[in-house]
């Protein structure tokens, strides 16, 4: 793979990762409520789900999912329901205990939240299936190129989520107690909204 092709892939990945999807909203909501550590752990969960979808795309499992609308909907609705549940809990706690900081999730829970938020978007497997052939050159080892693209994709996603978490946490730290309570509600609302948006998502027809 040429350096030019790799740079184009990284540029496309970076722009797409900047889009505020469920994983961005989850990590930002955790960071904006003061749980920076949980936000970083949730990022690992997101990357784990991404790695799974990337591997599935390489193995050709997109064809299996594409003919099974039931499998797509099950994954989507489970993820959407989970995001709506934790978002609602955050909002309820913020209203019922306005002076108290939100309870930080355990590392395992934060990891699972990140994984579910990303895994709830099965369209990722179609995206990877569509974009990989555009950058894998037939003159070089396909597996090495796929490995480079996969590692690059995860690194870019991790960097973008880390930057979102840093910015959100900085806003939280610079706020007054009153504003922090508002941010707690905003964080819950972000998750609630992302769950609703996810439930409205339709299966991609063009792989992107």
Question: What does each model-identified segment do?
Answer:
Residues 1-5, 205-208:
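Short, strongly hydrophobic alpha-helical membrane anchors
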Residues 3-73, 130-149, 154, 165-168:
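Juxtamembrane transmembrane-helix termini in multi-pass membrane transport proteins
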Residues 9, 38-41, 56, 75-76, ...:
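Small-residue packing motifs within transmembrane alpha-helices
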Residues 15, 19, 116-123, 155-159:
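Residue-level hotspots within pore-lining transmembrane alpha-helices
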Residues 48-52, 111-124, 187:
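Select subsegments of transmembrane alpha-helices in polytopic membrane proteins
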Residues 56-58, 119-129, 191-205:
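Hydrophobic alpha-helical transmembrane segments in multi-pass integral membrane proteins
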Residues 67-96, 154-160, 164, 174-208:
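Selective transmembrane alpha-helices of multi-pass membrane proteins
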Residues 92-109:
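Flexible cytoplasmic inter-helical loops of multi-pass small-molecule transporters
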């Amino acid at each position: 793979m040429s350096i030019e092709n790799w740079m184009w892939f990284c540029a496309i990945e970076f722009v797409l990762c900047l889009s505020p999807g469920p994983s961005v909203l989850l990590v930002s909501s955790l960071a904006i409520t003061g749980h920076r550590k949980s936000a970083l752990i949730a990022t690992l969960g997101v990357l784990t789900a991404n790695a799974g979808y990337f591997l599935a795309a390489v193995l050709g499992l997109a064809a299996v999912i594409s003919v099974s609308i039931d499998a797509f909907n099950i994954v989507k609705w489970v993820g959407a329901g989970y995001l709506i549940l934790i978002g609602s809990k955050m909002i309820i706690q913020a209203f019922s205990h306005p002076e108290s900081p939100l309870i930080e999730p355990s590392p395992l829970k934060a990891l699972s939240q990140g994984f579910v938020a990303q895994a709830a978007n099965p369209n990722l497997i179609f995206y990877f299936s569509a974009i990989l052939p555009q950058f894998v050159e037939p003159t070089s080892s396909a597996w090495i190129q796929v490995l480079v693209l996969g590692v690059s994709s995860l690194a870019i996603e991790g960097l973008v989520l880390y930057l979102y978490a840093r910015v959100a946490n900085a806003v939280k730290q610079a706020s007054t107690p009153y504003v922090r309570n508002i941010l707690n509600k905003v964080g819950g609302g972000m998750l609630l909204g992302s769950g609703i948006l996810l439930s409205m998502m339709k299966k991609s027809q063009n792989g992107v």
